[in-house]
């Protein structure tokens, strides 16, 4: 219960003003108090103070939260409902430990090699042409709706995870101006290898020597989302120790979720006297790729991209890191690219980690609103800096029969530089 104590005074301060209701994606879909930040705060308080049993039904309301953090920003008295929800999930894991969580997060996701082995069938599905055959024969239409949508979420998988083929050091082109540590996220390595390879090309082209340690583990966000706080702390200690071996100016990642989590390592380990200072120093160095590139002088891209683009703000970037101007600034560097802002660009797309699996109907309802906003822009490209958002948006667009492509802003910048051919 220790995680709850610092927040106990705050949640008693809830004045039930209802401002959080207007921004909560789950409340907007169901108009139920228990699906709102205000309702979850009340349930947490009553459960922890003994007025209600900490039952599976009560805890399920905490898992219904998409952790988009809009409620944190809008609360006039400083309650942070999204953080309280994560703490309540930890309480549930303490009271009723779930073995599958330990197996998944301590076993499968603790080592990159184990996770890569687990996804081998998916790569074979792509490499052997089975996926192409499934679509050619229309067999995908025979799958149950949920399975069909999950299959459609998968991008075109690389034959090998990027972590396996990426050199630990990528030299700067020309004079080295910066020495950068690169945190390659699990999803980026397994699913979006081409995208992260593009990120490294952009960094190298602009005078950065990039160090990408192969020994890093998961950032810890999946384990945190399911209440396994001790595992998050273990990941943090390991990753900090890995990067301490290298003298880098900054630690950069092109995954919004990873970046948001890495920046919280100082908070996660603030109670640990041995690690608190090291974690705080590590967190200060972490930057999203767009954040870092916006701080350094960049070469002007030579290639034009004559298309309309719109930008979706990932929750873990806009609210988790307060980064939203920088990606747009990068897009503005590309000649011919017309940025058309969508309505509610910073509203959650419904991805939220595993929510498309665990809260399928809600995730699709939230995504529907986002797709309507995208369609209104008539953009041919949707840019976003989060792999989860990219998969969610791509699936929704395909489901509506639309051909707009979903890409990382830095991948577009790399394209304007000439990509791999421009090296």
Go through each PLM region and give its residues:
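Short, intrinsically disordered, charge-biased short linear motifs at domain edges
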Residues: 1-11, 51-62, 171, 204-208, ...
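Iron-sulfur cluster-binding electron-transfer modules in prokaryotic oxidoreductases
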Residues: 81-423
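Cysteine-centered iron-sulfur cluster-binding motifs in ferredoxin-type domains/subunits
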Residues: 9-27, 55, 59-79, 316, ...
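N-terminal glycine-rich anion-binding loops that anchor highly charged ligand groups
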Residues: 19-22, 32-37, 210-212
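Alpha-helix capping and helix-loop boundary segments enriched in small/acidic/polar residues
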Residues: 12, 31-35, 223-230
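Short amphipathic alpha-helical interaction patches enriched in hydrophobic/aromatic residues
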Residues: 28, 48, 72-75, 266, ...
């Amino acid at each position: 219960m220790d995680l709850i104590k610092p927040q106990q005074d705050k949640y008693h301060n809830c004045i039930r003003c209802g401002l959080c209701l207007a921004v909560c994606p789950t409340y907007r879909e169901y108009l139920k108090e228990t699906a709102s930040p205000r309702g979850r705060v009340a349930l947490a308080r009553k459960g922890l103070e003994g007025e209600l049993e900490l039952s599976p039904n009560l805890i399920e309301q905490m898992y219904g939260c998409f952790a988009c953090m809009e409620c944190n920003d809008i609360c006039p008295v400083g309650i942070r409902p999204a953080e309280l929800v994560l703490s309540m999930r930890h309480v549930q894991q303490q009271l009723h430990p779930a073995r599958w969580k330990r197996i998944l997060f301590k076993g499968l996701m603790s080592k990159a090699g184990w996770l890569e082995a687990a996804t081998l069938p998916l790569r074979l599905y792509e490499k052997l042409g089975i996926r192409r055959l499934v679509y050619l024969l229309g067999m995908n239409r025979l799958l149950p709706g949920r399975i069909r949508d999950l299959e459609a979420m998968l991008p075109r998988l690389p034959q090998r995870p990027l972590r396996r083929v990426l050199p630990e050091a990528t030299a700067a082109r020309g004079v080295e101006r910066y020495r950068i540590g690169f945190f390659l996220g699990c999803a980026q390595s397994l699913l979006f290898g081409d995208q992260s390879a593009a990120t490294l090309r952009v960094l190298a082209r602009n005078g950065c020597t990039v160090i990408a340690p192969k020994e890093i583990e998961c950032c810890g966000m999946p384990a945190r989302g399911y209440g396994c706080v001790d595992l998050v702390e273990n990941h943090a200690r390991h990753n900090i120790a890995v990067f301490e071996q290298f003298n880098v100016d900054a630690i950069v990642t092109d995954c919004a979720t990873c970046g948001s989590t890495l920046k919280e390592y100082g908070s996660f380990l603030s109670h640990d006297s041995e690690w608190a200072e090291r974690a705080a120093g590590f967190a200060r160095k972490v930057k999203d790729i767009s954040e870092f590139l916006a701080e350094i002088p960049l070469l002007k891209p030579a290639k034009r991209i004559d298309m309309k683009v719109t930008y979706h703000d990932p929750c873990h970037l806009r609210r988790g890191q307060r980064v939203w101007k920088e990606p747009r600034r990068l897009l503005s560097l590309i000649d011919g690219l017309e940025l058309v802002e969508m309505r509610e660009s910073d509203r959650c797309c419904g991805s939220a980690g595993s929510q498309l699996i665990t809260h399928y109907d809600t995730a699709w309802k939230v995504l529907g609103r986002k797709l309507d906003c995208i369609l209104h822009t008539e953009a041919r490209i949707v840019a976003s800096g989060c792999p989860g958002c990219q998969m969610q948006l791509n699936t929704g667009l395909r489901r509506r029969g639309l051909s707009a492509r979903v890409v990382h802003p830095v991948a577009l910048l790399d394209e304007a530089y000439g990509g791999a051919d421009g090296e």
